[in-house]
């Protein structure tokens, strides 16, 4: 079993080889709009999954999937020529869902922005539930002019304390 670092390097190499082979070796016009986005290889280096996106509608995506299945043998042969492993991995092509997920995320962000604007409009026209200034200042009778509390009136016995507050 190969280490994961070797599998990752091999996956990147397979991604490049398949992308180049789609442009050079495969003459099918249905593969012109295919972009290889990622490749993953199992740790035993026997199976490679290649993720791709297709520029176009659902019909173009279905046509591209059929074209990739048809060209799978040519692409595997090209991968076998360009990588240095004992056994050429089998290839599996999977349509990548990143563009769909990205458009869904953009729609969610637009919806959140619209809701934030509604909340901001409601907040601008909102009024306080109680008085306008709920944090009133102290009334004049609550303010004590001296720093002493009323309980600390017996200070006569403190004169005979020394520096360390001992008697």
Swiss-Prot record:
**Major location (coarse):** cytoplasm
- Where is this gene product found? Cytoplasm
SUPFAM superfamilies named among the record's database cross-references: Ribosome-binding factor A, RbfA
Q: Which domain of life is it from?
A: Bacteria
One GO term under biological process is: maturation of SSU-rRNA
Does the entry feature the keyword Cytoplasm, yes or no?
yes
Q: Which UniProt keywords apply?
A: Cytoplasm, Ribosome biogenesis
Q: What does this protein do?
A: One of several proteins that assist in the late maturation steps of the functional core of the 30S ribosomal subunit. Associates with free 30S ribosomal subunits (but not with 30S subunits that are part of 70S ribosomes or polysomes). Required for efficient processing of 16S rRNA. May interact with the 5'-terminal helix region of 16S rRNA.
Q: How does it assemble?
A: Monomer. Binds 30S ribosomal subunits, but not 50S ribosomal subunits or 70S ribosomes.
List the protein's name: Ribosome-binding factor A
Organism of provenance: Paenarthrobacter aurescens (strain TC1)
Q: Which gene encodes it?
A: rbfA
